[in-house]
Design a protein with these regions (language model features):
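Conserved glycine-rich cofactor-binding loop
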Residues: 13-15
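Conserved glycine-rich Rossmann-like NAD(P)H-binding loop of the short-chain dehydrogenase/reductase
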Residues: 27-43
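The beta1-alpha1 cofactor-binding region of Rossmann-like NAD(H)/NADP(H)-dependent oxidoreductases
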Residues: 57-67, 99
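Substrate-binding pocket helix/loop in short-chain dehydrogenase/reductase
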Residues: 93-94, 101-103
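Active-site helix of classical SDR
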Residues: 117, 153
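Residue(s) in the substrate-gating loop at a strand-loop-helix junction
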Residues: 137
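C-terminal beta-strand-loop-alpha-helix "lid" module of Rossmann-like NAD(P)-dependent dehydrogenases
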Residues: 169-218
Length: 288
């Protein structure tokens, strides 16, 4: 008989979060879905499912996060799978973005993820089991003009995930950073992503086409979010999940291209880069 798992999914009101919640419920699991506003919208979208508990919280507010996790535990007694999905994109040249715009992006995409993870981990550690699935991005492996700042938050998610995995795997908790390519969610809708208010003319040739192309691409992305949700379901039930999972042909192609470029740069500069050690000194290494 299948063991009923309990999921906690942030940003569950739409996009990936909604589809993952729907897939988990269809598989017979329970879901704590968190939303920033309009909790009744998620309840209605999932047809008042008896195994759904909706909690309103803002991931940037640590007190709200702690309270929401406690509510979820009180309802279903445990959490088995955390999906850190809440986040948003920002299209801008790096110089164009103000300090406030950058900090807001990091508050949600990075510090919000950390807030939720800190709130859930004590319960996972207590049971010596569980999964942490962090939704990253293809831009967490490589970036294009206009997506550099957003990509930097996803590079952070990849690094945090790798560090968490090293610390949590010995405790029986698996961590995976999932980097999707472009999927037909509302990520590229003008209601979802943010554009910096300042536009600098010098970046028109590089960022301009990205800025104008986002609207044209919206709704025409190659990935199916329902199929993505099935991948997450499979991942959550895999005995030995990967640390990094790129999802979508575009994400894989982008990562492979970046890896090849990096390998070429390492080779081209190898003699220079390895010429910096002290002469005749044996030093310790942090690399196991």
């Amino acid at each position: 008989m299948k063991t009923q798992k309990v999921w906690l999914i942030t940003g569950a009101s739409r996009g990936f979060g909604l589809e993952i919640a729907r897939a988990a419920l269809a598989a017979g699991d329970r879901v704590v879905g968190t939303v920033r506003s309009n909790p009744e919208q998620l309840t209605t979208a999932l047809q008042n499912h008896p195994d759904l508990h909706v909690v309103q919280m803002d991931v940037t507010q640590e007190d709200q996060v702690q309270a929401a996790v406690r509510q979820g535990i009180a309802r279903f007694e445990r959490v088995d799978i955390l999906v850190n999905n809440a986040g948003y994109g920002m299209v801008t040249a790096i110089e164009e973005a103000t300090d406030a715009e950058v900090r807001k992006q990091y508050d949600t995409n990075v510090f919000g993820l950390l807030n939720v993870t800190r709130a859930v981990l004590p319960y996972l550690r207590q049971r010596k089991s569980g999964r942490v699935i962090n939704i990253s991005s293809l831009f967490g492996h490589d970036v294009v003009p206009g997506w550099g700042l957003y990509g930097s938050t996803k590079f952070a998610v990849e690094g945090i995930s790798k560090g968490l995995a090293a610390e949590l795997t010995p405790l029986g908790i698996h961590v995976t950073a999932v980097a999707p390519g472009l999927f037909t969610t509302d990520f590229l809708s003008t209601e979802s992503y943010v554009a910096a208010k300042t536009i600098i003319a010098d970046y028109q040739a590089t960022v301009g086409p990205i800025r104008s192309g986002a609207d044209a691409l919206h709704g025409n992305q190659p990935g199916d979010p329902k199929k993505f949700a099935q991948v997450i379901l499979q991942l959550a039930n895999t005995e030995r999940p990967p640390l990094h999972l790129l999802v979508g042909k575009d994400a894989i192609a982008m990562c492979q291209s970046n890896a090849a470029k990096l390998a070429q740069e390492i080779e081209a500069w190898l003699l220079v880069a390895t010429s910096t050690d002290h002469d005749q000194r044996i030093t310790a290494s942090i690399i196991a």
